[in-house]
Regions:
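Second-shell loop/turn segments in exported
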Residues: 1-2
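Glycine-rich active-site loops that engage anionic ligands at enzyme catalytic sites
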Residues: 5-135
């Protein structure tokens, strides 16, 4: 995975503080081909490098942007297909802070479809936010 530290420095910093991360990953109900895990950064991460149109391999951070509070819902996710990001209240911005290289998209699709059909799976992230590349 390529970390987009120049494009989303506050996001990379906030998410990087949670690593190593272990939690359950689930398939999205609203944004299509997306696998996500709920997190809690304890920070008010700003919109940066944000979009509502994701591409395969995009690694994103989402929060309830409209709530100016510390106890909002937050998630990290990876997309295995192009999608419009949305929530039950409509389109939602996400911060793109990483990209999985195209050579791994088939594996992403396989994992995403398996989670979609069979349910959540344990997710472990061992990436070091100070590195430009993550395994």
């Amino acid at each position: 995975m390529t970390i987009l530290g120049d494009d989303a420095p506050r996001t990379v910093e906030a998410v990087g503080k949670l690593i190593p991360f272990s939690g359950m990953a689930y398939h999205s109900r609203w944004s299509g081909r997306e696998v996500n895990a709920m997190i809690h950064t304890g920070e008010r991460v700003p919109l940066e490098n944000h979009t509502i149109q994701t591409a395969p391999g995009d690694v994103i951070y989402w929060r309830e942007w409209e709530r100016d509070a510390d106890d909002v819902s937050e998630a990290i996710a990876v997309y295995y297909g192009a999608e419009l990001t949305r929530f039950h209240r409509g389109e939602q911005f996400v911060n793109v802070f990483g990209r999985v290289s195209q050579e791994h998209w088939d594996l992403l699709r396989e994992i995403g479809e398996r989670i979609w059909r069979q349910g959540g799976e344990r997710l472990e992230i061992l990436w070091n936010a100070s590195q430009e590349q993550a395994p």
